[in-house]
Structure formats: structure tokens, C-alpha cells
């Protein structure tokens, strides 16, 4: 760093312009030419001190500049004349002390002569006549008159009474408030000495030119807040502005405004260090601050509780890991996933072991598990318990007489109303026997209704397995036995069709014993009862056994509790809306109850019993239909009554959102081994279908059956499946899906829908028997499959000689040894047991004539398509290709 300072840097530090610094330096005897002139540190400090305080050691030792020589004895007199009250306002304490000590005096320069009084005193006249008197040079005081007083105003001021002119004037220091005692004691004798002197301005004979100085002080308007008395005096400063240059009223009496404090942070960023003192020197580029990164030590995660359905990134957040770490671990195990894929239970366990974290899986629907809440919160009051009727489910193979047996018990003809004579809906009825009610649930026996049968087994107390005595145990019978054993309910075997001559009850007992159901008379615990749905034989014994089993079970429930029921079937009926067929398991279901059923909710609007009659309530184990739900409920779901509509709405909405998110977010992750399978699956032909059914149970059965119809080449793609009639929106969806077929089960399209379907080219097929629907879909899939090409050998020939025909090719002279050779047929050339060529016969001749075929034992000439490498001893095998269609079942 250099030992000099520039003038402009001194000006910045002193808060003045460079010209002021040059002028002040000239007073101190330092010659400066321009703001870029370099000054030593000592001179710079002296100039700054002089500009700030008005004092300097060099100024004290400097010889006084006196323009005119005057007599010494007149100095004191001139000083007294200058010390007027006006000057006391405009001077400062330290300057007055310097006058007493007779320092070097500077001339006071007045901008304009003031003539306030027409008559002048003798002393003033003498002063004007002797302009060579020494006038002390005052530093930093210039009085600038803003307005020249008019003659009328001067005359008015002259008429002011002498008493007013003698009033004590306030000094500038007193006005500014802050004059110390020393200054007051010094001013008091001066005031007394000057009481007789008129308060007038000191004038000069000639008007001196005003020295132009840089205005680096603050203008002070002294007439702002003072009394009228002061404003009306002769020496008032009204209409004038005083420019105070470098005044020093000591450090505590500075008139100029204090500079605003600068932001230290901003100053440090935008200015470079000062040459001296603490004043910024100039702009500089601030250094880039280092960002302080506060690292918080994260607590190590040892265990997490996560929902059942969780994505990769959600699991990573819960474990405090990045998704990349989780994906890397799964990739090392041969699993290709993205951060949006769902994780399975075994994958969560593997990740937990890999990261050393205990993973606990929580059911996302646990908080809205209304069934569990109902079972836990329901007060058990045994005093309110009553015996409830048993719920009996009839199950068995198709066409074994289940519905006919139930019709005989109810004395009705339900089976006659079923399409094709087979049950395709799950139904329930209540029968009274000896004053006791029994609720029967009839299930379909077809293979497609496996889920229906399982649902019937879950809501029942007693299961009756119907087996035809002449037919024995069949496929669906074995399935029914499995459902019955899984339910843990008592089982009764009804051997139907005992009126037939071919009935063989012992065969049925033996077959059932092989399946684990041993009759009582064979030493087992299963009751076998022979019945006939046609004649009614054995039905009374069957009902008595049912009541006996119910008595042993001691079935009881609380009819005063809130209702709990199971939906065994659901549908959407025109004019009624969503309808649920339910069996009450506990409590009493009444009209007006707020109910929730899985993802649906509502208020019970109407109830009908099993005969279709409207009732106000359903009691224990009674069956009926309920209206009032907002949507068609899921078959097999539990219906519960609650206190408020808000409660049921929140539960249903939450469960619906979860179900929808789960459906839309099916995982797309595959293993590395499955990649080739996916590539091959892209070649599989699909048959898109839309399924509409009358009830939810049938819809479920049809959808499950169609999805099972698939092989390596074709499969069924269910675009949409719903309960209800065929609407125009289904046609729009079918058109958008491309070559989509609409399948209706027990539903019919209206005339307008048919017309629109014909115009749009959409195929609608309706069925009333599930067999027909499945068979038609199989035929459609079979038509989509490629035909199988089968080869059939037609003959064989041996090459005896070869002939080369120019520009034609090689002709093989052959002898037909087996069958016949056909022109245009396929042929293989076999040489030493190896097939060297497979192609077509382009030309066949016998002697010189073209022939269509040559039989066994005859010679012929054969040419092949684009092949001439024929040798003697080759064998020619001819064959034809036959295309054969295949079915899905094959």
C-alpha cells in the first residue's frame, strides 16, 4: 500500500467536494492542482482536521494576511463595533475566544450593504471614512440576503419604540438549546457593554465582491419556530438564509445534520478499506460468503410402521433412504421396479433385513374397519338375547334338485322360472315349521358360481349338501364339501331323487365317506337323509333335523342392537335404484337407519320381505331387500347401521378412495425372467368385451369364467363390467375400445340403443343361460386363433438320371416308387438321409407331355422351383399341406 492519499479520497472522507479540499489546503499553504493529486498522510490528516474543526497548527503559525495597514490602537474599537447582537447570533464560541486572544483576523465579507437607519452615528461615520481599519477575518460565515427590504419597510422599522429595540435578544446558541455556563458567563459582560449600541449591521464604504465558495454546509432557516417578538426585531433573520461554512460550536453543537448511519454489512460488501480513519474509500467487489451448512444428525431408524399398499418412494421416505437405494437392492434380487411401483409383503421383509429395519405392516383400512368396530363397541347384554332362527344354505351339483327341494318345502315353483331350469342367482327364503322360522339360502350349482357358493357358506349356520341318489358325487359336489368344511358349520346330506328306480343311497354314502363325510349309521357324525323333491318324501325328517341342529347350536342374538347384515345379492333395478338382498345377523334393520356397506352408504328408504311385500323392519335371521344405498354394493359385504349420516359417509368415502387408488395403481413390476414372457404376450390376440348383468353375483361369475378362457395365443380382455342395462355410454366405450363386443346377461337393450349400435357397428349379444354365453365367447376366440397346418405324404420317387436343358435347368428322370407325384405339390429332396431341399414341383412331364400327376410304377421328368443341384440316387418325397382349425379347449 502506498504512503500517499488522493485528494478525492480526502474529500470523500470529509464529506466535501474536491474543490473545497483544494481551497482549504491552499489556506494551509499546500498547493494542490487536481483531485488526482497525491498528498502525504501528514498533510491529509492536517487538511481533514482543518476542514472538520476549523483549527490547524499550521494556520496558527502562518503570518496574517492583512490587505490594508491600520493603526493598532483602533483594533479594539473596531472589534467592539463588530460585536453586535447580530454577530452574537452568527458566531460560535471558539471563534469569539480567538478574537479575545487577538489571533490572526480574517475579513468579514457582507454580500450587500444594509441601510436600515437613515441617520448614522458619529462612530459609524468615522468607520466609513476610515476603511483601512483592520477587520478580523471571519471564517465560514456568509450572510446572503434573500430579499432586499423596501423603503416603506425601513421606515416602519425606524418607528419602532426604543423599548422594543432594547429587549434582550436570544443568541443562536440559546435558540438551539445547549449553551454551556462558560459561554453564558462570557456573553453577559458583552451584552451590558453593547446595550447602548444600536443594533445595526456593519457596513463598508465599497461593496466588496462576494467570494464564491463551495457550499458544503447545511442551510439553516432560523425563523421557523421562534416568537413574534424575535421575528419583529430589527436584527431578526426573517427573509434571510444563513450559510454556515465549517462552523464549530464544539463537538456537541453541530448545526449541520448528522449523516445517516450506513449499514455496516453493506459497506463491507461495497467499499474498499479507507486510507485512514474509518471512512470507505471506494467500491470493490465483495467476497463471496461461504455458506454455512448446518448438518443435523438424523436419528437412526430402527423400526417403521407402513400401510399394506406402499410404493417404492414411500417406503424409502419412511426408512430415511433414497428411492435409488431401494431400487438397487431390488434390482440385485432380479426385480425391475420404478419408484411408483407397489411392494409386496415378501419384498418389504427383504428390504427390512437389508437395511436393518424392523418393518411392521398396517392395514390401511384399519381405521375405517366398521365391522370390527361394531363387534368391539357393541355392548353385550345377555338379558336382551333371544333365540334367532337358523340360516340354512342348500348346496350341491347342478341339476341335483336343490331348487326343486326348496320349492317343495316352500310349496312354490321357483325352479320353473329359472332360465334353462338351472339356478343362476343366490336367493333366500324364510319358512315356518312348527311355529319356528328357518331361513334358506339357495346357491347355484354351476362351476361358474363358485364364489357365490363360498359366500353362502360364510353366512350360514347349517349346510345341506344335496346329492342325487342316482348320480352320486360330482365335481361341484367335491367343491361344496370343501366350502362346507372350511365354514365349520354342521353338515346334513340330503340324498335326493330317492323315488327313482336307479337310486343307490349306499353308493352315495360310500363316495361321501371317501371325501371325509361318514354317515352316522356307519359310525360317523354326519346325518344322511333320503328325500324326494317330486313326492315330498323325507322332507319332514329333514326339517326336524335342521331344528335339532339349531337347538344344539343355541343361536342367540340381540334384537335391540344396531343392525348388522350380510349382502348376499345386489342389483340395479329400474325405478328403484340400487337394491341389496340381505340377511340380518344381529339387531333389527329399520326404515330410516343410516347404513354403510363397504364403499356405499345411504339411508334405508324401503324394505321388502322374501315375498316382495313391504315391511317396516327386518328381524333376526330374516331376509329381504333394502333400498336407499347410493350405489350397488359389493356382494358378500357387511351392512351396518350407525347413528349419523356423517359417520357412514366418511367411512364409505374413505374406503371408496382407497379401493379406487388400489385399482388404478396396479403394480407393473416384473422380474428379469418374465421379460421374455411379456414380449411374447404382446403377440397374444385379445377379445375385448363389455359385460352387463342383472345382479352382482352373476356378473362376478361371468367375469371370472371369461378370464379363465385363455391360452398362449388368445384371451378375453374385460374392458368394463357392471350391473344394469345396456346404455349408450356402453356403446361409446365399445367403439373407443375397437372391435369390442357387448355381452348382456338377463338384460336387454332398448330400441334407441339397438339403432345406435347398428349405426355404429357395435355387436350386442344377450343371453339368459350362462352356458350359452361362455360357449359363444369360446367360439369367437377359436376364430381368432391361427389354423394348424398338417402335412400329408402323397408319394415317393427315386432319381435314376439327370438331364441339363440349356436356359431351362436340370431335369430329374425319376421312377415313382410309392403313391403318386402331383404337379404343383410340395416336395423334399433327401440325399443320404438328409433333406437338402424343400420346395415345390414346377414341372412334371411324362415323355414330352405335361401331366398333372404320375402314379406308382411309372417314370417321369421332374423340375424343381429354383433348384438344380440334383444327383442320381436322391429320393424325392412329395406331400400336401392341410389347414385345420382349432378351438380354445384344444
UniProtKB/Swiss-Prot annotation:
GTP binds at residues 396-403, 442-446, 496-499. Residues 396-403 are annotated as: G1. Keywords: Cytoplasm, GTP-binding, Initiation factor, Nucleotide-binding, Protein biosynthesis. Residues 135-148, 200-210 have a biased composition (Basic residues). Residues 421-425 are annotated as: G2. Residues 110-216 are annotated as: Disordered. Residues 496-499 are annotated as: G4. This is Translation initiation factor IF-2. The gene is infB.
Amino acid at each position: 500500500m502506498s504512503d500517499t492519499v488522493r485528494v478525492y479520497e480526502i474529500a470523500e472522507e470529509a464529506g466535501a467536494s474536491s474543490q473545497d479540499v483544494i481551497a482549504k489546503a491552499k489556506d494551509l499553504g499546500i498547493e494542490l492542482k487536481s483531485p488526482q493529486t497525491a498528498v502525504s498522510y501528514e498533510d491529509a490528516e492536517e487538511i481533514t482536521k482543518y476542514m472538520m474543526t476549523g483549527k490547524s497548527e499550521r494556520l496558527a503559525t502562518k503570518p496574517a494576511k492583512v490587505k490594508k495597514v491600520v493603526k493598532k490602537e483602533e483594533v479594539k474599537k473596531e472589534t467592539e463595533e463588530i460585536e453586535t447582537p447580530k454577530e452574537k447570533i452568527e458566531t460560535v464560541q471558539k471563534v469569539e475566544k480567538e478574537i479575545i486572544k487577538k489571533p490572526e483576523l480574517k475579513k468579514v465579507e457582507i454580500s450587500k450593504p444594509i441601510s436600515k437607519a437613515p441617520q448614522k452615528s458619529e462612530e459609524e461615520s468615522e468607520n466609513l471614512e476610515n476603511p483601512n481599519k483592520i477587520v478580523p477575518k471571519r471564517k465560514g460565515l456568509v450572510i446572503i440576503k434573500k430579499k432586499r427590504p423596501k423603503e416603506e419597510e425601513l421606515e416602519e422599522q425606524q418607528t419602532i419604540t426604543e423599548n422594543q429595540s432594547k429587549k434582550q435578544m436570544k443568541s443562536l446558541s440559546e435558540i438551539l438549546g445547549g449553551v454551556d455556563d462558560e459561554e453564558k458567563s462570557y456573553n453577559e459582560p458583552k451584552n451590558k457593554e453593547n446595550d447602548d449600541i444600536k443594533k445595526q449591521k456593519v457596513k463598508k464604504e465599497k461593496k466588496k465582491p462576494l467570494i464564491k465558495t463551495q457550499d458544503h454546509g447545511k442551510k439553516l432557516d432560523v425563523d421557523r419556530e421562534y416568537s413574534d417578538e424575535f421575528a419583529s426585531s430589527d436584527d431578526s433573520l426573517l427573509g434571510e438564509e444563513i450559510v454556515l461554512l465549517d462552523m464549530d460550536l464544539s463537538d456537541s453543537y453541530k448545526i449541520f445534520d448528522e449523516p445517516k448511519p450506513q449499514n455496516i454489512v453493506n459497506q463491507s460488501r461495497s467499499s474498499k478499506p479507507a486510507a485512514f480513519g474509518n471512512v470507505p474509500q471506494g467500491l470493490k467487489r465483495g467476497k463471496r460468503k461461504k455458506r454455512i451448512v448446518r448438518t443435523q444428525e438424523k436419528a437412526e431408524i430402527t423400526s417403521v410402521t407402513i400401510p399394506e399398499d406402499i410404493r417404492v418412494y414411500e417406503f424409502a421416505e419412511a426408512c430415511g433412504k433414497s428411492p435409488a437405494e431401494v431400487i438397487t437392492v431390488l434390482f440385485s434380487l432380479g426385480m425391475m421396479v420404478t419408484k411408483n411401483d407397489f411392494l409386496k409383503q415378501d419384498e418389504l421383509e427383504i428390504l427390512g433385513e437389508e437395511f436393518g429395519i424392523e418393518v411392521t405392516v398396517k392395514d390401511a383400512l384399519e381405521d375405517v374397519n366398521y365391522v370390527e368396530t361394531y363387534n368391539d363397541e357393541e355392548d353385550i347384554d345377555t338379558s336382551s338375547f333371544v333365540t334367532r332362527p337358523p340360516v340354512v344354505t342348500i348346496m350341491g351339483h347342478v341339476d341335483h334338485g336343490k331348487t326343486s327341494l326348496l320349492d317343495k318345502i316352500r310349496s312354490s315353483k321357483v325352479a320353473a322360472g329359472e332360465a334353462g331350469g338351472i339356478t343362476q342367482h343366490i336367493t333366500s327364503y324364510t319358512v315356518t315349521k312348527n311355529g319356528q322360522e328357518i331361513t334358506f339360502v339357495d346357491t347355484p350349482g354351476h362351476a361358474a358360481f363358485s364364489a357365490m357358493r363360498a359366500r353362502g357358506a360364510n353366512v350360514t349356520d347349517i349346510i345341506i349338501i344335496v346329492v342325487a341318489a342316482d348320480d352320486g358325487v360330482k365335481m361341484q359336489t367335491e367343491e361344496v364339501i370343501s366350502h362346507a368344511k372350511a365354514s365349520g358349520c354342521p353338515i346334513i346330506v340330503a340324498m335326493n331323487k330317492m323315488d327313482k328306480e336307479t337310486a343307490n343311497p349306499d353308493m352315495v354314502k360310500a363316495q361321501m365317506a371317501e371325501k371325509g363325510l361318514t354317515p352316522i349309521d356307519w359310525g360317523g357324525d354326519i346325518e344322511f337323509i333320503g328325500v324326494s323333491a317330486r313326492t315330498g318324501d323325507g322332507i319332514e325328517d329333514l326339517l326336524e333335523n335342521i331344528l335339532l341342529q339349531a337347538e344344539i347350536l343355541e343361536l342367540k342374538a340381540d334384537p335391540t342392537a344396531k343392525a348388522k347384515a350380510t349382502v348376499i345379492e345386489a342389483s340395479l333395478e329400474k325405478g328403484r335404484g340400487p337394491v341389496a338382498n340381505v340377511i340380518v345377523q344381529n339387531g333389527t334393520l329399520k326404515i330410516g337407519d343410516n347404513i354403510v356397506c363397504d364403499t356405499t352408504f345411504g339411508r334405508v328408504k324401503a324394505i321388502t320381505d322374501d315375498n316382495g311385500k313391504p315391511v317396516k323392519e327386518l328381524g333376526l335371521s330374516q331376509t329381504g331387500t333394502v333400498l336407499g344405498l347410493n350405489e350397488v354394493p359389493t356382494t358378500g359385504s357387511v351392512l351396518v347401521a350407525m347413528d349419523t349420516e356423517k359417520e357412514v359417509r366418511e367411512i364409505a368415502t374413505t374406503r371408496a378412495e382407497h379401493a379406487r387408488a388400489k385399482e388404478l395403481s396396479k403394480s407393473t413390476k416384473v422380474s428379469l425372467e418374465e421379460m421374455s414372457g411379456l414380449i411374447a404376450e404382446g403377440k397374444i390376440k385379445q377379445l375385448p368385451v363389455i359385460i352387463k348383468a342383472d345382479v352382482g353375483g352373476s356378473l362376478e361369475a361371468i367375469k371370472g369364467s371369461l378370464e379363465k378362457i385363455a391360452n398362449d395365443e388368445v384371451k378375453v380382455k374385460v374392458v368394463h363390467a357392471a350391473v344394469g342395462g345396456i346404455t349408450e355410454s356402453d356403446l361409446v366405450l365399445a367403439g373407443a375400445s375397437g372391435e369390442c363386443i357387448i355381452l348382456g346377461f338377463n338384460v336387454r337393450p332398448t330400441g334407441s340403443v339397438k339403432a345406435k349400435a347398428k349405426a355404429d357397428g357395435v355387436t350386442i349379444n344377450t343371453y339368459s343361460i350362462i352356458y350359452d354365453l361362455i360357449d359363444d365367447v369360446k367360439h369367437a376366440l377359436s376364430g381368432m386363433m391361427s389354423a394348424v397346418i398338417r402335412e400329408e405324404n402323397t408319394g415317393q420317387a427315386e432319381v435314376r438320371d439327370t438331364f441339363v436343358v440349356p436356359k431351362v435347368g436340370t431335369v430329374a428322370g425319376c421312377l415313382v416308387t410309392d403313391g403318386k407325384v402331383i404337379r404343383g405339390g410340395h416336395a423334399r429332396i433327401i440325399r443320404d438321409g438328409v433333406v437338402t431341399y424343400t420346395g415345390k414341383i414346377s414341372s412334371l412331364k411324362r415323355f414330352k407331355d405335361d401331366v398333372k400327376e404320375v402314379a406308382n410304377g411309372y417314370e417321369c421328368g421332374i423340375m424343381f422351383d429354383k433348384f438344380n443341384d440334383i444327383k442320381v440316387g436322391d429320393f424325392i418325397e412329395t406331400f400336401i399341406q392341410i389347414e385345420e382349425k382349432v378351438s380354445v379347449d384344444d
